[in-house]
Amino acid sequence: MKLYVSLRTLASVSTLVVATSAFVSPGSVKVPSFSSSLSASDGEFDFDVAIIGCGVGGHGAALHSRGQGLSTAVFSGGDVGGTCVNRGCVPSKALLAASGRVRDMKDTAHLESLGIQVDAASVNYSREGIAAHAKNLANRVKGNLENSLIALGCEVVEGRGMLTANPQEVKDEATGKDVILAPGSIPFVPPGVTVDEKTVYTSDGALELGFVPEWVAIIGSGYIGLEFSDVYTALGSEVTFIEAMDTLMPTFDREIAKQAERLLIRDRPIDFRTGVFASEVTPGIPGVKPVTIKMIDAKTKEHVETLEVDAAMIATGRVPNTANMGLVERGIETNRGFVNVNGKMQVLSCPEAEGSVPELIPNLYCIGDANGKMMLAHAASAHGISAIENICGRSHEVNHNAIPAACFTHPEISMVGPTEEQAIEMAEKEGWTLGKSQGSFRANSKALAEGESAGMAKVLFNKETGNVVAVHIIGLHAADLIQECANAVAAGTTVQELSMIVHTHPTLSEVLDEAFKGAVGMSAH
């Protein structure tokens, strides 16, 4: 089956217009005329690999493709870096870094314990300056990505590829032997919510930091909502979480979530409503008219409360950006927009369900958020590398259980593998015994020196084999500490082996050393 893809090109920075003079296929990529010194290795195609989308996943695939000597074209949609670089991971870390400094400088009790005296009333910040820091960082990283593609000889085309069943409508073409779909995702806005990106906004609008509201409601208490609650409270806002589930942070390990609630919510100007839907959210006017939020019980659907706040941030997750890509027209069924793929990232014709047998679509791959395997930037990059490995004939599948994740609050939260609740179910189903060991920041010399000794690390392991199943951490620099654990899961390293590895003293890594040693009955120094 031959697939064709038309290309929407950028008419201006802010406007996309459809151009039918271009298409892409596994088999063929048609684009507005451009010249290239690259050509496919077999001479039959202009490019070995065509990548639709240039977020972290598409960029990672492109780098590895060129590293393997494959001629590569990337159709960026005018959005090199994608969500992560332009509207997500990168600029949000800039906001967290700046607001975190403000929080630290206003924490006079903590500073005085270190022998530092600061007048909290004299600590000021520039909203515009913090917003500029985030924007400048995003632009800098985006430029680095663009330069890396150019330096390696990738053909970067501004435009978004779409599968089409009618190649006769297009004119100029460049052919590609294999095609990788990497369109990413967009914020999910629930029914009844009106977004004006001024007083009611998604994470896209929040990153611009247009104003710092006195009172902001955050709808959803996952990674995104937690991180922005950290930013807002540090800058002086009061926050109300609105969560549909019965508990805050419903996807987190419950023990970690309870500690997070104590450290990140109860000690701050934050309150919350759980078990309710924001059934209707109406924008306001800053300083003039409040945002109105009507809430209903998640079970009974009865109205329970109406809130009037200065702003509302919608942090209810993300959905795949696969609309209008021509998937349905080519007979490719999605599951709520997610493209079904096998372990090798190869696109299948439909989701697995009773009565349907997915067929492999030759030469077509889908990576990152759009396939729904794991909606993380570094997972998308791993998908891209894996797809190229399989294109090169080297069978490869990503081990998602070994991919770490982090929430960059103060203190940070990180994890790899299933939650304890999920691990208990796995052990019962598969017939093995789950072990658990913990390390504490409270007795860690480095954490005590910093005056930030709240937190813990929890190691879950298979008692029969000693293999690490999962690790969950909350505490200072948890996002950096988790990588050692992810490596252990990926390599199949046992707690017996980990307990004998020497950790630098005094460092935060000794929190993990304590947990590893505890797993085998040893005491840590």
What are these regions (language model features)?
Residues 1-28:
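N-terminal chloroplast transit peptides
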Residues 24, 32-42:
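N-terminal mitochondrial targeting presequences
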Residues 44-47, 56, 63-70, 75-212, ...:
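Glycine-rich flavin
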Residues 50-52, 161, 174-184, 218-219, ...:
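Short hydrophobic core segments
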Residues 52-57, 61-78, 90, 94-95, ...:
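Flexible, glycine-rich terminal cap/loop adjacent to redox cofactors
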Residues 58, 222-225:
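Catalytic nucleophile loop
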Residues 62, 66, 229, 233-234:
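Gly/Ala-rich phosphate-binding loop of Rossmann-like dinucleotide-binding domains
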